UniProtKB/Swiss-Prot annotation:
Gene responsible for this protein: fadR
Keyword Cytoplasm: yes
Predominant localisation class: cytoplasm
Protein name as it appears in the record: Fatty acid metabolism regulator protein
Species of origin: Salmonella paratyphi C (strain RKS4594)
Compartmental location: Cytoplasm
């Protein structure tokens, strides 16, 4: 186990998470007692207690008053906030993880973008107008793309869509910095934003679904061509 962490708490957190991932602490089992675990990891019990509380909030553990701490099946108990951690734990599965993430984005955005354009066209146009002055480089486009999807999610009037996008932010923007290094990807995105703006102006809400699906397909093809050069820094850095 190779752990890169910048603090005792970060080290303890990564140690426990990787131990769960590698079945040293299998889901459904009981975590070692606090004293034993703190000595095993090499941190104070106070530090360990703080880490356990954080991991419980993220769904890795269940802390029960007066009872041993239980290791959860994180697939069933955690949220989108662990996406970057999963990417770090299993780099070989990152392409599939990203495919799943982008598929979810396309599927839900067909709903909230159409709703935003239909019910709140002024807000939608305000969001889409931010694409007019974007700098032509990967970092700027990664931030723009995330903010446009997130902005349209909130413009739909249903904040739950926005919260879902919030949960995707870390891994989403890391993917974007790699993807938008491709000039074809940047050009495709600008065309997509312009198309949405035109549909909004025309009130052609019935065309949004196919437009979003087409963009998901075309951007996915570019992404798949780029996957063989996937960088190793998509995962979250140690604390």
């Amino acid at each position: 186990m190779v752990i890169k962490a910048q603090s005792p708490a970060g080290f303890a957190e990564e140690y426990i998470i990787e131990s769960i991932w590698n079945n040293r602490f299998p889901p459904g089992t009981i975590l070692p007692a606090e004293r034993e675990l703190s000595e095993l990891i090499g941190v104070t019990r106070t530090t360990l207690r703080e880490v356990l509380q954080r991991l419980a909030r993220d769904g890795w553990l269940t802390i029960q008053h007066g009872k041993p701490t239980k290791v959860n099946n994180f697939w069933e108990t955690s949220g989108l906030n662990i996406l970057e951690t999963l990417a770090r734990l299993d780099h070989e599965s990152v392409p599939q993880l990203i495919d799943n993430l982008l598929s979810v984005r396309t599927n839900i955005s067909t709903i909230f973008i159409r709703t935003a354009l239909r019910q709140h066209p002024d807000k939608a146009q305000e969001v889409l107008a931010t694409a007019h002055e974007v700098a032509d480089h990967a970092d700027a486009f990664a931030d723009l793309d995330y903010n446009i999807f997130r902005g349209l999610a909130f413009a739909s009037g249903n904040p739950i869509y926005g919260l879902i996008l919030n949960g995707m932010k870390g891994l989403y923007t890391r993917i974007g910095r790699h993807y938008f290094a491709n000039s074809e990807a940047r050009s495709l995105a600008l065309g997509f934003y312009h198309k949405l703006s035109s549909l909004c102006e025309q009130g052609a809400h019935d065309q949004v679904y196919e437009t979003v699906r087409r963009y998901g397909h075309d951007s996915g093809e570019i992404w798949h061509r780029m996957q063989k050069n996937l960088p190793g820094d998509l995962a979250i850095q140690g604390r």
